[in-house]
Amino acid sequence: MFKGSIPALITPFTDNGSVDEKAFAAHVEWQIAEGSNGLVPVGTTGESPTLSHDEHKRVVELCIEVAAKRVPVIAGAGSNNTDEAIELALHAQEAGADALLVVTPYYNKPTQKGLFAHFSAVAEAVKLPIVIYNIPPRSVVDMSPETMGALVKAHKNIIGVKDATGKLDRVSEQRISCGKDFVQLSGEDGTALGFNAHGGVGCISVTANVAPRLCSEFQAAMLAGDYAKALEYQDRLMPLHRAIFMEPGVCGTKYALSKTRGGNRRVRSPLMSTLEPATEAAIDAALKHAGLMN
């Protein structure tokens, strides 16, 4: 259903801090032209925590409008408030999204039973396929493979996971708990090669914002079983995977885009639009290593 390279899209801002709809639409068009296999608006990389509800909904709508069914749109619809998650999910469904990305509730640290109840409530409120977003480093809660399996058995529209645990053995554990048809997408660019080798089928990628064609070709090689070719792409992309996260958040990604495509580097507070000189130098070197900048 969903596979390959699926960028977790940035949300561009203007100099005055508002959402730059023209730049976002152009970014979506470029992603599709470069071979991306799907799109995820308003996830972590889209700075969803600092978007208003109206902005969140508008970015989802715009992504769907521009994509025009050429590639699937998996709309970010997560919250640590169950009612709010349902509201965002219903809006994405009405707007025409193809699926939902629903993050595990962050900060309030629900139990496994609480996670089951939260995702069950969202699944029962919508008809769209749901991809669970499990990211313990940010949400401070880790959905177990057993809870995931119970959700899959209880709700036919819970169909996959974006796994950002960094634990490659989870792919096998989740396949056992959730079944062979459960869609497993890596949430970490650097470990996507190993993730697919364990049975994953793609990556919801940050680096694909900057290198969509390379990331798409990397995933295509793996899905074709050509791991020797995939390893060449891995070596070409790995410095970039690392460099854009030398400082937290999406600042590094937006800096890289400013160098390759002239994008606005602005992020919303409390993130910082400026980077340390050493970070900029590392990103520049990584872009050159990947063949994306002279």
Curated annotation (Swiss-Prot):
Binding site for pyruvate: T45, I204
Catalytic activity: L-aspartate 4-semialdehyde + pyruvate = (2S,4S)-4-hydroxy-2,3,4,5-tetrahydrodipicolinate + H2O + H(+)
Location(s), subcellular: Cytoplasm
Keywords of the record: Allosteric enzyme, Amino-acid biosynthesis, Cytoplasm, Diaminopimelate biosynthesis, Lyase, Lysine biosynthesis, Schiff base
Domain of life of the organism encoding this protein: Bacteria
CDD domains: DHDPS
One GO cellular component term: cytosol
Single annotated GO MF: 4-hydroxy-tetrahydrodipicolinate synthase activity
Pathway where it operates: Amino-acid biosynthesis; L-lysine biosynthesis via DAP pathway; (S)-tetrahydrodipicolinate from L-aspartate: step 3/4
Metal-binding in keyword set: no
One GO BP: diaminopimelate biosynthetic process
EC numbers on record: 4.3.3.7
InterPro entries, sorted: Aldolase_TIM, DapA, DapA-like, Schiff_base-form_aldolases_AS, Schiff_base-form_aldolases_CS
SUPFAM superfamilies per the UniProt record, alphabetical: Aldolase (SSF51569)
Activity regulation info: Is allosterically regulated by the feedback inhibitor (S)-lysine.
Active site: Y133, K162
Site (described: Part of a proton relay during catalysis): T44, Y107
Site features described as L-lysine inhibitor binding, chain residue numbers: P49, H56, N80, E84, Y106
Gene3D superfamilies: Aldolase class I
rRNA-binding among keywords: no
HAMAP family on file: DapA
Described purpose of this protein according to its UniProt entry: Catalyzes the condensation of (S)-aspartate-beta-semialdehyde [(S)-ASA] and pyruvate to 4-hydroxy-tetrahydrodipicolinate (HTPA).
Quaternary state and interactors: Homotetramer; dimer of dimers.
Family per record: Belongs to the DapA family.
Name listed for the protein in its UniProt record: 4-hydroxy-tetrahydrodipicolinate synthase
Species per Swiss-Prot/TrEMBL record: Agrobacterium fabrum (strain C58 / ATCC 33970)
The organism's taxonomic lineage, starting at the top: Bacteria, Pseudomonadati, Pseudomonadota, Alphaproteobacteria, Hyphomicrobiales
